[in-house]
A protein has these predicted regions:
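Conserved catalytic cores of very large enzyme subunits
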Residues: 1-306
Length: 306
């Protein structure tokens, strides 16, 4: 009954996957299976860590992946701030194929992560130097032994993760572009951009096309493949910018931490049919609200592919 209400409750977690992830993530630090099984109440939203031996206060930034689709559409220009944020790569109108547009997106993503990692290092350093949590650090294994607070990487299984949100909005938008502009040719770039610039007001017919394009969460192979490809490319490019703040291998955790609300006013209308100002999609691999229409089993199958 609760699931059917569509409220996003209760939360479903695959604990076998969480244990396996901890074993891989902390393998170089000698984690045991028993330790990996001592998962606490979830760190943050859907993050995982080791109870009494891990910390989750240091972040590598919170990128808005849906915004990167905007940068790809407008060649590094931000319609919200009216500033050229990233170097020009290639105008969307000059991309003869979806693959050309996708390649441009990845290049903008590379610029974004380069800037973000520098900013997050500065923020983490400031937190460590100015507001270290000494009391809590004393309660975590490893801090006293190493003489380091949790902000400095003292816990035995410390981690500094990139909270990656709005990935489903980005994937749905990319598929809508592929479907409507390149595959079926129902729209041109000029038509789509006019509708987006107007926040779909007066272009409700185009919004209907965008909203009706196949979406993540319905067990549609092509959509699921693109969603998975996008997430893997995000991780690959993020990790290419070096280790995390503590010097360990960089990792991501896709979830929202409510940033899907914060990002809403600064993210324009998107090709997935969403209007500017409307909250982006919550959680990690949940469907865009109102678009998972093939039942809960289809949603779970799509989520497992992402």
């Amino acid at each position: 009954e609760v699931v059917r209400s569509g409220s996003g409750q209760p939360q479903f977690m695959n604990m076998n996957a969480a244990v396996a992830r901890s074993l891989v993530r902390f393998a170089s630090r000698g984690i045991t299976l028993d330790e990996a099984r001592t998962l606490p109440v979830i760190f943050g939203c859907v993050g995982t860590g080791i109870q009494g031996k891990g910390s989750y206060v240091t972040f590598e930034g919170q990128p808005n992946l849906a915004k990167l689709v905007e940068f790809a559409m407008y060649d590094g220009y931000d319609p919200h701030t009216r500033k050229q944020v990233f170097p020009n790569v290639k105008p969307a109108e000059e991309c003869a194929t979806f693959e050309e547009l996708y390649d441009a997106l990845l290049r903008h993503m590379d610029h974004a992560y380069d800037a973000q990692r520098k900013i997050s290092d500065l923020g983490n350093s400031t937190r460590e130097q100015i507001v270290p949590n000494i009391f809590r650090s004393c309660l975590l294994d490893g801090c006293i032994e190493s003489g380091l607070c949790e902000e400095a990487g003292g816990p035995k299984y410390s981690q500094s993760l990139c909270i990656t949100s709005t990935g489903i909005d980005a994937a749905n938008s990319l598929y809508a572009i592929k479907h409507l502009i390149y595959d079926t040719k129902q729209l041109t770039w000029e038509q789509l951009k006019k509708a987006l610039a107007a926040n779909f007001e007066g272009y409700e017919d185009i919004q209907k096309l965008c909203f009706g394009a196949p979406k993540h969460g319905n067990d549609i192979e092509d959509v699921d493949q693109l969603t998975r490809r996008f997430f893997r490319d995000v991780e690959r490019i993020y990790r290419s910018h070096g280790p995390d703040y503590f010097g360990y291998e960089a990792h991501m955790d896709p979830f929202s931490l409510s940033y899907h609300n914060y990002f809403a006013p600064m993210t324009g209308a998107l090709p997935n049919g969403r209007q500017k100002g409307v909250a982006l999609t919550d959680a990690s691999v949940s469907a865009m609200p109102g678009t998972d229409v093939n039942g809960s089993t289809a949603l779970i199958k799509s989520a497992a592919q992402a």
